[in-house]
């Protein structure tokens, strides 16, 4: 993480930059020539480079083999460019596909973009270079109709197999009322049921061998150990898992499409529901990305308040994860203890925000209101209460010999495998890599806090992942202690024209600010045309928002990258060859909710 200099970290995150000075731009030009690329200036904070489709695979291979390589395909998706008006200096395109890569050794990213015309919509698959490209490419085809040549199984992933059309195209309806009334006839019902029938041959699976007949078993989508509406089709030889196919999409709500019809301000409540246990943690990357577009620098008090709420929700989520993991292994009591502890967190959150699970409390340029009187006492009581409770969880359950025997060494993978599948969060850190965005790429003032990043001993297994989460809660309490003792004075909103809603006191004195308030609340603020990006360390891994503004009151394109999506894609590579009982332990150790997967 030494490649990012102090000077670079100190630069305002909302500066529009083309990153021509980034070493990777020079490396690419030395290899492919100075005229091979179009470098786009954005507020994403990373180099954005348009490349020719014919050179895409060669360039990706080059990045993968650099001395300090780009080893993770972090994200991949598309955009309908046909209605975008602010495209000066960019290659002509009806559609585009972007590829976001991370170099761990450099602590730097690069985003490649490919321009496509409507009558020639195809890109080559990256699955032979990055295996986690599989699901991302399926979703890109499904949402935009962009063909992926060479993909091993290009089929729908979020929508039913019988669905027609590509929902993220600009000419596709955004509201249910724009569709014709739906009528479920007997013929349609039979068709839907047939589409859910699993055909092993479609996935390259054999029904039998010369000596064995395989059994195919549906685990889910309503099995309690599936942790939501999630289905895994298992190919079994007795109790051994020969192969499996995760089936997602049952919780898909079109969160990215919603971003195109909500104002920048009114989309905030939707962010809470992306990962419904994370609360304010979900709001953080969105409001930071919007603030980059607007050029807003929030007061220090706002930064610390946001950190405080985020860490409260981090502990809240981890408590549920650890207790349900213990329940999956076979012990019931810790779940009930955990809900008692989580209630104490909700008491603090409700006193501050007025809500519990989904506060929708962060604002563009600040927070909804200042901290209430007495918040210090509530937080103090919680911080005094929790340490002994964590010790009890550890001693009575997590260090139990039965649990250790069921979890230690189960569903194990190393750092190279984690990076190849886009794994982040505790799953990656358990392999020994301390990649935590709060430390490596500080946001919202995290660089001012003293805390450690727990890591594992080189192999990420079910037991090491859960023990890391336990230590992460202790580190979150260290951060909360510092928030309590060092809360800065000052305003809870930035003094900026695009702060939404604007400061109320001004609307009572000036007609101009009253008009601004009315327009921003009714129509929403108008953001400058640009692109911005923000990643954060969420409760389950790295979460990010990649926003495209076309100079309107609404986002032109809202891309939500969640950690749980690649974590579930990784399942077959980890669990094949293990027992069904090991799969239950593995699922419990991942820490996911299906809203985070399906969006």
From Swiss-Prot:
Catalytic activity: a quinone + NADH + 5 H(+)(in) = a quinol + NAD(+) + 4 H(+)(out)
Main location: membrane
Start and end residues of each stretch annotated as NADH dehydrogenase I subunit C: 1-189
HAMAP family (alphabetical): NDH1_NuoCD_1 (MF_01359), NDH1_NuoD (MF_01358)
Pfam families found in the cross-reference section: Complex1_30kDa, Complex1_49kDa
PANTHER family: NADH-QUINONE OXIDOREDUCTASE SUBUNIT C_D, NADH-UBIQUINONE OXIDOREDUCTASE 49 KDA SUBUNIT
GO molecular function: NAD binding; NADH dehydrogenase (ubiquinone) activity; NADH:ubiquinone reductase (non-electrogenic) activity; quinone binding
Entry function: NDH-1 shuttles electrons from NADH, via FMN and iron-sulfur (Fe-S) centers, to quinones in the respiratory chain. The immediate electron acceptor for the enzyme in this species is believed to be ubiquinone. Couples the redox reaction to proton translocation (for every two electrons transferred, four hydrogen ions are translocated across the cytoplasmic membrane), and thus conserves the redox energy in a proton gradient.
Region (Disordered): 1-21
Compositional bias of kind Polar residues: 1-15
Region (NADH dehydrogenase I subunit D) residue spans: 213-599
Topology with respect to the bilayer: Peripheral membrane protein
Domain of life, per lineage: Bacteria
Subcellular location(s) per record: Cell inner membrane
Entry protein name: NADH-quinone oxidoreductase subunit C/D
Enzyme Commission number(s) from the entry: 7.1.1.-
Subunit annotation: NDH-1 is composed of 13 different subunits. Subunits NuoB, CD, E, F, and G constitute the peripheral sector of the complex.
